[in-house]
UniProtKB/Swiss-Prot annotation:
Keywords, ordered alphabetically: Cytoplasm, Pentose shunt, Schiff base, Transferase
Catalytic activity: D-sedoheptulose 7-phosphate + D-glyceraldehyde 3-phosphate = D-erythrose 4-phosphate + beta-D-fructose 6-phosphate
The protein, known as: Transaldolase
GO biological process, alphabetically ordered: carbohydrate metabolic process; pentose-phosphate shunt
GO molecular function: transaldolase activity
Active site per the UniProt annotation: K132 (schiff-base intermediate with substrate)
CDD domains given in the database record: Transaldolase_TalAB
NCBIfam families attached to this UniProt entry: PRK12346.1, talAB
Matches recorded under InterPro entries: Aldolase_TIM (IPR013785), TAL/FSA (IPR001585), Transaldolase_1 (IPR004730), Transaldolase_AS (IPR018225)
PANTHER family named among the record's database cross-references: TRANSALDOLASE
Compartments, record wording: Cytoplasm
Gene (UniProt): tal
């Protein structure tokens, strides 16, 4: 019998959620996603030392200022890891903008353009890159600007329906609604486990997917942040799912039928008027889970970015 991973691939584009090139090569996903935490993890792998050295060499050629060298090294390291990953995936790499720019539209746009230029200078075209931005109002506005320039974006740390709706209305290429982190919040609050079909993260992504398809939005829905394969299988049929190596391994070892749960209705319901900033803030802030998890996610990515910078600073 075919494995659950093989069956899932027939229903959904499988993406690897890791910066570990060896793991990516093992599971042959279509795309790969990275974030500051995954770049930090990858930077600690011995085999990646030459990529760090090359990034430092690049940074030293750009500036004599040590603080600037640290920034440039981190950016180039993310790009160098992305370049290596693109040698083993046929599709796209997602590279994230510094989380400390999450509330700065202009800063996010500038950083995104810089990352794209680094990729372009290395011979990587825009159609192989997604720029990751936090799904704050400012991040969504940055994505709206970048999409018009031909720079596709992946809006991450998405926990509320308000965030999802605003992303679709801004015409962003792809969103990454988080499943496991939503479940974590409800599990802590209610003190119980959830069956996959009633998992609050699964319910959230299902609702977003159906809304997009009913209203004919082209924005790709890529479920992210999974805690178990039950959550993944409940979202079979979603446009894309980005999955960590340990869960890809579980899916590869599991057999049994995988049932398509999400189906594109190709709807053409009338779309509501685009949300205003005030409406977005009001709707998003009605969801205590989303408010807490978005803030926590930004803080944690910023902490790991700081750790990476501290590690790089010792090598300059």
């Amino acid at each position: 019998m075919t494995t659950k991973l093989e069956q899932l691939r027939k229903l959904t584009t499988v993406v690897a959620d890791t910066g570990d090139i060896e793991a990516i090569a093992k599971y042959t996903p279509e795309d790969a996603t990275t974030n500051p935490s995954l770049i930090l993890k990858a930077a600690e792998i011995t085999e990646y030392a030459p990529l760090i050295d090359a990034s430092i060499e690049y940074a030293k050629a750009q500036s004599n200022d040590k603080a600037q060298q640290v920034q440039d090294t981190c950016d180039m390291l993310a790009v160098n890891i992305g370049k290596e990953i693109l040698k083993v995936v046929p599709g796209r790499i997602s590279t994230e903008v510094d989380a400390r720019l999450s509330y700065d539209t202009e800063g996010s746009v500038a950083k995104a353009r810089q990352l794209i230029k680094m990729y372009n200078d290395a011979g990587i075209t825009n159609d192989r890159i997604l720029i990751k931005l936090a799904s704050t109002w400012e991040g969504i506005r940055a994505a709206e600007i970048l999409e018009k320039e031909g720079i596709n974006c992946n809006l991450t740390l998405l926990f509320s329906f308000a965030q999802a709706r605003a992303c679709a209305e801004a015409g962003v290429y792809l969103i990454s609604p988080f499943v496991g982190r939503i479940m974590d919040w409800y599990k802590a609050k209610e003190g119980r486990d959830f069956e996959p079909s009633e998992d609050p993260g699964v319910v959230s992504v299902t609702g977003i997917y159906n809304y997009y398809k009913e209203h004919g939005y082209n924005t790709v829905v890529m479920g992210a942040s999974f805690r178990n394969i039950g959550e993944i299988l409940e979202l079979a049929g979603c446009d894309r799912l980005t999955i960590s190596p340990n869960l890809l391994q579980e899916l590869e070892e599991a057999t049994g039928e995988v049932v398509e749960k999400l189906v594109d209705t190709n709807g053409n319901k009338a779309r509501p008027a685009a949300m205003t900033h005030a409406e977005f803030l009001w709707d998003h802030n009605q969801d205590a889970m989303a408010v807490e998890k978005l803030a926590e996610g930004i803080r944690n990515f910023a902490v790991d970015q700081g750790k990476l910078e501290a590690m790089i600073a010792t090598k300059l």
